[in-house]
Amino acid sequence: MTDTALIAELWDVIVDRRLHPVEGSYVNSLLSHRKGIDKPLEKVGEEATEFILAVKNGESDRIAEEAADLLFHMLVALNAADVDLSLVLDELASRRRSR
């Protein structure tokens, strides 16, 4: 599986969980929390801090783990904000082409 296919698959799962909630799903617990969009945003902040600390402290074994957590929670937050992943990818592509 390619890197982009893995991210696309993860995105598809997040979208599907929002459309078809699954009891006990972590994604659904974030998307349906009483705090609304604040819950996934709190997780983005938490995971960003953990990622920064892992990098700053040179904890190479934790950097990839924290980056994965951050990426996952960013995807959930994007979905909660009704922003499709394709818009983010288009923006990245546009920045790449402008070089």
From Swiss-Prot:
InterPro entries listed in its UniProt record: HisE, PRib-ATP_PPHydrolase-like
EC number(s) stated in the UniProt entry for this protein: 3.6.1.31
Keywords: Amino-acid biosynthesis, ATP-binding, Cytoplasm, Histidine biosynthesis, Hydrolase, Nucleotide-binding
Top-level lineage group: Archaea
GO molecular function: ATP binding; phosphoribosyl-ATP diphosphatase activity
Compartmental location: Cytoplasm
Catalytic activity annotation: 1-(5-phospho-beta-D-ribosyl)-ATP + H2O = 1-(5-phospho-beta-D-ribosyl)-5'-AMP + diphosphate + H(+)
One record GO biological process: L-histidine biosynthetic process
Pathway linked to the protein: Amino-acid biosynthesis; L-histidine biosynthesis; L-histidine from 5-phospho-alpha-D-ribose 1-diphosphate: step 2/9
Record-annotated disulphide pairs: none
GO cellular component: cytoplasm
EC top class, as a word: hydrolase
Pfam families per the UniProt record, alphabetical: PRA-PH
Similarity comment: family membership: Belongs to the PRA-PH family.
NCBIfam families (alphabetical): histidine_hisI (TIGR03188)
Protein name: Phosphoribosyl-ATP pyrophosphatase
Protein source organism: Methanosphaerula palustris (strain ATCC BAA-1556 / DSM 19958 / E1-9c)
